[in-house]
């Protein structure tokens, strides 16, 4: 085990100097992975009773307004201020672009799928003290397809990027809208 804590860390990548970053859900979307570190969990502090403090969110922003549970009010997509802030609290995948096929502005920035907002968020990683801060970049992709739930991004040897999605109307807070009869993946 490299580190402990967080909630649903579904994306992981390294920048060009070997620093680990991962994406998560509920209690923040971007974390700097430090070996041996302890991070906040969704419920409780875990079993590390002698830890002075946990390492906080790397991002200086959230992709939603209010509490993460407010997402349950929305059915098809992020609305209002949450839409403007980046789409919601659920993120999957995490790709730090190190290729040379895209414009230089994307190099060493992290891309992550926002499953509620039907988009790919982009955060700009900047050095701050002994760590990093993630600043909100412009959303890279916004889908108008209600079935779109991005999962991963990865770049190939030529610098081109491949993305996968989970085409389904349901997601993690929807128990009756999941479309299970098509077998689509």
Tell where the protein language model's regions lie, with residue ranges.
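Beta-propeller domains with acidic blade repeats across secreted/periplasmic ectodomains
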Residues: 1-185
